[in-house]
Design a protein with these regions (language model features):
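Accessory alpha/beta interaction modules
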Residues: 1-157, 170
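Short, charged alpha-helical interaction segments and adjacent helix-coil junctions
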Residues: 2-19, 77-79, 84-89, 175-272
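Active-site-proximal helix/loop capping residues that flank conserved catalytic or ligand/cofactor
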Residues: 25, 39-40, 98, 125, ...
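Pocket-edge structural micro-motifs
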Residues: 128-131, 165-166, 202
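Low-complexity, glycine/alanine/valine/leucine- and proline-rich hydrophobic stretches
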Residues: 148-157, 162-167, 177, 181-186
Length: 272
């Protein structure tokens, strides 16, 4: 029979091994200082095999002393000096158009130094990889750029916003990348640049230790669930006492934090 400690360790391993790159924290671990993996993302999404990633950072905090600051999931720079912000969004509410606009603007203000000319402003790409097709046209990619209404020509200001629909998982290069985002086993990944890191994170002791915050998040969720369960049990016992003392359904609902349906069910059991 497993001890509590061994059982908890087994559960944690299961949690880690069930993670995929659509999990924001796990994606961060997969791409942290991993130029090759970041390069795959950018090359496939932009359709450019010549992109060379110079550096990649996760959870980059950009301070705005005059307004809203932001923490970017993934921030990469390529050999041409272009900046790429990649955000994974499982919630539709996390990927509104104005958020993409704001992220594009803070990249501009952060990377143009006071002594630089406007012409030196680097090209920026804000890429939202969404769990659902938030723009609702069933396209795999949505490339969004400013244009001139009168002649439909692009307004070349160097800013790019891209939405990637992760529901489109066909046999194209992009579709296979989307398949990999939902894959939990290294051996089943299409892109080998992801496999080695995933193998390390999921199946090595050092990798498990590296994922401390994921484990802590799991433990916090577990503790919260236990606390809620304990509180619920206390509320049930309290409600039983009120009903046994002849208090009304309405009074018991008001004071026990249980729903009316739950209190009525308790009352029917007590009177049975």
């Amino acid at each position: 029979m497993q001890t509590n400690e061994a059982s908890q360790e087994s559960e944690i391993k299961q949690v880690i091994r069930s993670l995929c790159m659509m999990n924001n924290r796990f994606m961060n671990f997969m791409l942290d200082d991993n130029k090759e993996a970041a390069q795959v993302f950018l090359r496939v999404i932009l359709g450019d095999d010549k992109i060379k990633v110079r550096n990649v950072r996760i959870q980059s905090f950009i301070q705005n002393i005059y307004g809203h600051s932001s923490q970017l999931d993934i921030l990469a720079q390529d050999s041409k000096g272009r900046y790429f912000n990649v955000e994974v969004q499982r919630s539709d509410e996390g990927a509104p158009a104005r958020r993409a606009r704001f992220y594009s603007s803070i990249l501009d203000t952060h990377f143009l130094q006071p002594s630089k000319l406007y012409e030196e402003l680097p090209d920026t790409y804000v890429i939202f990889i969404t769990e659902n097709d938030v723009l609702h046209d069933n396209l795999p990619l949505y490339n969004i750029r400013r244009r001139i209404d009168e002649n439909a020509k692009c307004f070349e200001d160097g800013s790019h916003i891209i939405y990637v629909n992760s529901q489109r998982r066909d046999d194209t290069a992009l579709g296979k990348l989307m398949q990999d985002l939902y894959c939990t086993e290294p051996k089943n990944l299409h892109y080998h640049e992801f496999a080695e890191r995933m193998e390390f994170l999921k199946y090595s002791k050092e990798g498990e230790e590296k994922m401390t915050d994921v484990i802590e998040e799991y433990a916090a969720r577990k503790a919260e669930a236990v606390a809620k369960e304990t509180a619920k049990e206390k509320n049930i016992e309290f409600a039983k006492g009120l009903l046994a003392d002849g208090m009304s359904i309405e009074f018991t609902v008001r004071h026990s934090k249980l729903t009316e349906a739950e209190v009525r069910e308790l009352a029917s059991k007590l009177s049975a």
